[in-house]
Amino acid sequence: MSWRTKLTWKVEWDDRARKELRKLDSPIQKEILSYLRVRIAGSKDPRVFGQSLSGNKAGLWRYRIGNYRLICRIEDHIFVVFVVGVGHRKEVYET
């Protein structure tokens, strides 16, 4: 017998990332949240839309939303994309 259930990805936020999101303008916040809801949470593999990072951020993934970036950790075993950073592309990699 073969069966398949549709598993969706859950997006969770680090407290610092949530604070960074609140500092952004409202239209940018909405665009980021919409991107996460439509592209990431609804996908079979969230890696398709992102790019893996290297160096001191190895193991993390980044997602481009205009001039803004989401830095995330993907937890395959529990189907969670954990947002650890969000900000303008010139600043988000500094921390």
Positions of the model-derived regions?
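A short, surface-exposed loop/turn module that caps and links secondary-structure elements
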Residues: 38-62
